[in-house]
Structures are given as structure tokens and as C-alpha cells.
Amino acid sequence: MSAKDVKFGGDARVRMMEGVNILANAVKVTLGPKGRNVVLEKSFGAPTVTKDGVSVAKEIELKDKFENMGAQMVKEVASKTSDIAGDGTTTATVLAQAMVREGLKAVAAGMNPMDLKRGMDKAVEAATEELKKLSKPCPRPMAIAQVGTISANSDDSIGTIIAEAMEKVGKEGVITVEDGTSLQNELDVVEGMQFDRGYLSPYFINNQQSQSAELDAPYILLYDKKISNIRDLLPVLEGVAKAGKPLLIIAEDVEGEALATLVVNTIRGIVKVCAVKAPGFGDRRKAMLQDIAILTGATVISEEVGLSLEKATLTDLGTAKRVQVGKDETTIIDGSGSEIDIKARCEQIRAQVEETSSDYDREKLQERLAKLAGGVAVIKVGAATEIEMKEKKARVEDALHATRAAVEEGIVPGGGVALVRAIAAVKDLKGANHDQDVGIAIARRAMEEPLRQIVANAGEEPSVILHKVAEGTGNFGYNAANGEYGDMVEMGILDPTKVTRSALQNSCSVAGLMITTEAMIADEPKDDAPAMPGGGMGDMGGMGMM
């Protein structure tokens, strides 16, 4: 085990604070509409230009181990806020720096760190309740667009396209972000349920122009095993042929004689059929087949529940308004399943999303939920160069998270105003002793910091503007983009409540840990490896080796 370097008391806290300042000073220049960019070196390729706080924080590793510990703890604030709310990382970092700075001054003056922490926690709790009271729901597409615009660093094209996507696929819908091929942002919306499996034979194609199989008002057969024997399928095929409707078969696989017979029947026009493989693998395949069954009103033919293919009837089949099968994907539009069943299935999947601890599983469950509940929208980000594309894509993803948070918990006035208004709830708060009162004052002072930083980044005098905003009431605030005062909500400067709340709670949590730190332990720096001995061979008079 390597030797350790241990620092105590004020010495440890000072080193930790230096690390906090290095990280926070690099991150906070990005805050607000007039925030600056940060350029990040990459080990290969062009450098990355970003205004995203968490991207800057993640890049920072310091040489001094004790400074690095401080930086990593604040980095945790940014990451945690990003994970919970998807945005607000810079605000959280600015709040944490202010709380730690003021807290360590109080500790150096001889106050009890534990009482300071209790006071800060009490103040943040009161401020959080006040934020919830200030919060207003975010129903209008216009408000969603404004939240997206603010989060995307005042790029209104991003805010507008996100609002449009949300309107089309609903709150539960999946919105994904991809690299585009043009200079403009584009929006693609897939209605209905789409999964990534195409036709098993090109002979099923009936629309030569789009190279797809299109089935109007088809029956849908769902089977969880392979189909290789046509005899098993005959009863269903005869029933479908009599009804004069097309048939979509979704099974683990359709092969051999069964596939050949289906192709021949389709070519001759006896019955219009298309076969596709079931989506997913293993348990996920079973779950997705069940989703399709509920969406279309079908029953999954499975030997596990005592159903066999040769005994299947038309009542076991589902229906939909239209099905489109391409080379790589199948889209079922307007399935005829019951609304009540679909809602119940969505609730079940939501419960699984809450329970799962795996990010991958959560993503897949949310995809399934979107396919059942709304649809899928793809935002294709357009840019002139790859560097711009990466930077813009990161901003779109940030804005998307922020708008989801706004829909979830509502909105508060932006530009640091909500936190200034929340100070009112903390003003008359009293702690159990003097040190707790100082803790409350520390949190109160820190809550002014985001507004001060936004104003400083805009090149104005923070104290003057803060005083004027604090004298106002409600949504009155300062628009740093154009230097005007007014109603922040009317000016479209909004923050999701969830983002502001998470930033405040997470920064207080880490600041509390840091001011109550009394010792820090790190590995001793290793001495450089000894130099290689001079060349030469034994008994040869130290003859140099070439």
C-alpha cells in the first residue's frame, strides 16, 4: 500500500477551496445570454467549443490531489443536476462555489461547521418550498419554445423545433437528436408504432416507388416461435382470404416451405401477406409482442399460454388502419386496441421505469412507452462544420431536457430572478443558535450569485442591478440580452422549476459536506523513476554501448 499524504483543518479546506475556484471559474463564464465559450482540447481531432457547464466541468482534472478533490466534489454537483434535470449545471456550480466560499470564511472565524450546515439546509428547504409556490404550469407550446430557447443559449430555432416535436408526439413521446445532412435543423415524426424489422422477402413489396409493402386495414398475427410448416398457418390463411383482407405476420421467423407458400400466394394475388421478424430479443421480444398485441387488439399465439397456431382463429388476430413495411422497419398506424388496455399497459411500463436501476433498461422502457403512448420524433441538427455540429447537438440535447423538466414541474421566471424572489422566504427564518443563523445568511447570499454572475458576464455592475431586481416583485427582472428591465415571463425568459430546485438542493448538499471537512487524505506523489544506469558491460572496462 502506498504512503498517504494527510492534511488537516484550515490547510485542507484552503487547498480544497482552490480546486473549487479553478473549476467554478472555468464553468461560470458560460452563464447567461452573454456567457462566453470554453474551448476543450481533444486527444485527437479538432478541439470542442462549448457553452455547456457540465461538458466544461467533466474536462477538469487537477495535478494537486487536494485541489482535485475539491474540484471533483463540485463536478459531482454539476453531474447530479444534469442527471436529474438535464440542465442548470452552471447555476449549480455557481451556487456551490458561493456557499463553500462563505461557509469556509465562517468556519475560519471559529463557527461550528455542523450548525452552519444545519442553517444552510433549513434555508434551502424554505427556498425550495417558495420556488414551488412561484412555479406555474407550462401548457403552451410558446412557453415550451421559450424554455428551449433559453436553455439553448438564446437560439430560438432550437426552442421552436423542440416545441413542435413535443406538440406532435406528446409528453410521453420519444424525441431523439441526430446529426443532420443540411445546414438547417429538420424534424421527422413517425406516427404510430415503429420497430426495426423489415420484410422477410422482397416479393412482399407492393409499392415499387417506395420499395415497401403497404397493407390497408390488415389482420395482424403475432406468434412467438418460428413458422416453417405451412400446414400450421392454413386455417388462418383461409379465414383471412375469405374476409378479403391483407395479413401481417409477426413471428420469431418465417422460413422454408411456409415463406415460399406465402410469397407464391402474394404474387398470385390469392391473399395479400407480408411477414416480418418480431422485434427485440429474449424477454424484451416477448414484452414488445405483448405491446403490439395491446395496440392492435390481438392475442399473442404462444404455447406458454396453451395456444397453438393451427387452432388460431380470426378473433385471435389484431387489426390496424394501415401498416407500412420497409426494408428495415415496420410501422403500425392506428391500431384498433382498446384505449383502456393501452393506458393500463403504459402505467405498467412507467412503474418499471421507476423501479429499474439500469440506464440501458430505462432507455428501452421509455422507448416502448413512447411507441405505445405517442410516437417518435427525430430532430436532425444542421450545421456547416463538424465542430459546430457537436456544439449545436449538445445545446439541443440540453434544451430538450430543460423542456421536459418544464412540462413536468412547471416554470419560474428565469435569469436568476426566481432565486432572488425565494430569498424572501428565507429572510425571517431563524435558526436554533447564532451559528445556524449565519448558515441561513450564507445560503441567502449564495442565492443572489447566479443573477450577479449573469450580469457580470454581460459586462454590467452586479450590485446595482441586483438591488433594483430585489426591490421589484413577482416576475420583474433584468434581461441581460438587451439590458432592459421588465416581466421575465412576458419577455420569454423562463427556467424550469425542476432545474432551479435541483441546482439549489445539490449545491447545498455538497457545500455542506465540504465545510464540515476536517481532514483530507491523498496518495503521496510518487518520486520520478531513477535514471537508467550508464551503458557498459561487466569486465569490459565500462565500454559504452552504441
Curated annotation (Swiss-Prot):
Broad EC category: isomerase
Record keywords: ATP-binding, Chaperone, Cytoplasm, Isomerase, Nucleotide-binding
CDD domains in alphabetical order: GroEL
InterPro entries the record matches: Chaperonin_Cpn60_CS (IPR018370), Cpn60/GroEL (IPR001844), Cpn60/GroEL/TCP-1 (IPR002423), GroEL-like_apical_dom_sf (IPR027409), GROEL-like_equatorial_sf (IPR027413), TCP-1-like_intermed_sf (IPR027410)
Keyword match Isomerase: yes
Compartments (UniProt record): Cytoplasm
Record function comment: Together with its co-chaperonin GroES, plays an essential role in assisting protein folding. The GroEL-GroES system forms a nano-cage that allows encapsulation of the non-native substrate proteins and provides a physical environment optimized to promote and accelerate protein folding.
Protein name: Chaperonin GroEL
Organism: Allochromatium vinosum
Originating gene: groEL
